[in-house]
Amino acid sequence: MLPEWPAGTVAVLSTAGPHAIPVSTATRAGDRAIHFALAHTRDSLARLREEPRCALTILAAGVAVTAYGTADVVDADDRVAYLRLDVESVEDHDQPTFSLDEGVRWHWTDERAEAGDAEVRAALQRL
């Protein structure tokens, strides 16, 4: 089962290749699904269309998991494709010897990019 994590948490999407990129739109969509968005220009999107198996590693305060499964495009607009990762298994990296105090701290430096991100997140919530 997937844990909860804060909006904007930076996660790492790993696709065939191997190839990995940070994503900040990963949204929990139930116990076994994650929604996220990728720009149409992302190599990762092309890779997922070719080979949908992937892993998403989520690191936030109190959360250290990798979700394994297959991702498919479920919707798109002119800027991004909206994907659903159907989670087959979750590896919990939690250990009794350490604790994650926080995830990656980041912020937008461009107001238009920040507004666009808010629109993408709202669309992900509607999926």
Model feature map: region roles:
Residues 75-127:
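C-terminal edge-of-domain segments
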